[in-house]
Amino acid sequence: MGNPRPRPMRLAEKLLQIRTGLGLSQTQMLERLGLGDTMHYGRISEYEQDKREPTLMTLLAYARAASVHLEDIVDDDFELPRKLPGNVNYRGINRKSRK
């Protein structure tokens, strides 16, 4: 079956950086992730304090919310951008289509 993957050592730090970089509270982060109906905001705190590891689907939601690659979040060798671009499609803001 293969070897288990090593746990990212900087995951909690990066998840906190994403939330604060987007200027969101923990409750707002849940809403931004689309998880407000299925998860309590305390779970965000557990992720940020390295008390719980998020699921792959949650990590993908973080990557979408911050408009970064999943590898930027889970690979300790990659850094998140200082200024997060955020999701330009969030709340009805649409990108201009290229012709």
Tell what function each PLM region has.
Residues 1-22:
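A short, Lys/Arg-rich alpha-helix, primarily the initiator
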Residues 51, 55-72:
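DNA major-groove recognition helix of helix-turn-helix/homeodomain DNA-binding modules
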Residues 14, 43-46, 72:
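Residue-level recognition of specific faces of alpha-helices
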Residues 34-53:
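Recognition helix of helix-turn-helix/homeodomain-like DNA-binding domains
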Residues 27, 38, 42, 71:
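Key DNA-contact positions within bacterial/archaeal DNA-binding proteins
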Residues 10-13, 23-24, 39, 54-57:
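Residue-level signal for the short linker/turn that defines the boundary of a DNA-recognition helix
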